[in-house]
Amino acid sequence: MNAVGIDVSKGKSMVTILRPFGEIVSSPFEIKHTSSDIHSLIKLIHSIEGESRVVMEHTGRYYEALAHQLSAADLFVSAVNPKLVKDFNNDSLRKIKSDKADSVKIARYALDKWQSLEPYSITDELRAQLKVMNRQFHFYVKQKTAMKNNLIGLIDQTYPNANTYFNSPTRSDGSQKWVDFVSTYWHVDCIRKMSLNAFVEHYQNWCKRKKYAFNKSKAEEIYTKTKELVPVFPKNEITKHIIRQAVDQLNSTSVTVETIRTLMNETASKLPEYSIVMQFKGIGPSLGPRLMAEIGDVTRFTHKGALTAFAGVDPGVNESGSYAQKSVPTSKRGSSNLRKTLFQVMDVLIKTMPQDDPVYQFMDRKRTQGKPYYVYMTAGANKFLRIYYGRVKEYLSVFPDPS
């Protein structure tokens, strides 16, 4: 048995090959992530007598190209959680951190865990692309939130509280009514210079041009409030440029978010479990694809507990002797993006209150018992995943491919 430990980094890796009882087949050596170096590594591993298993840490995206190439060459590859390697066999008082030492440690880990190593599975392109889109979606949502807060901070200097006049949801093209409003009426003097009738007429034409619903009483309310506001910045070209620039940046990011949201739904609809996932209460064309992106192929989980552990919503355990802690926080060792999506699904269930949904009934019962907010929300996420696992896996066993 030959344990190949690979410490992966950007563009290069450190490789060590060991056998039981400390026998060194190959001392640590470096390879580049090029086709020639990877081919040479594959040739070397195949030339060694006995069964060989390759182990590496799944850190970021650096390992995927190497793991994919080695798996395609009919080698046993296992990508393990970096924390498992970090906590493995720390029996030295010396603290050594180098690529060579890490590759040796990974090889020793492979020998010790030989029988329990899980083979690396190549994710199909559709699921991989969906997951990348979901990560990009989360990235741009953060950017959108930052730009929205920036715009609100700016208009507080020219038109305080203008962002609170409308609560219309974001359109499919990324536009929002309050953002379009402050783009046109970027300063209180844009309205105060007009009479009430003139503003109502101007606002009506603006609503018609932007395809928003017009309400005369709303226009009169805005005019009355605006008359009492005190701006900080003067109404000039510099102020106008600052506000319009912030609006353009927010609109651009918002368009990107909605484009990715639509593309994710189109991509997810090609997966076999799409129809059954969309039947869950609390799931829609936005949350459904995001949930499917983070969970991936549910059949790779051996049981329900494996899925809840993957999400990090499994209950913790703290017992010693006669002591047993009753309330233990969840592990939170899994995907933070998945936990966030689950929390949003639970939030939808709490707000819509579907009386026939077992997850909502469970959360409502916990809430009635006086459980804290985060306790019943996390418990609901755990129950949701267990139901998700059962329904989706059963569906895929009957209808594995919609085509």
Tell what function each PLM region has.
Residues 1-403:
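A detector of single, family-specific signature residues
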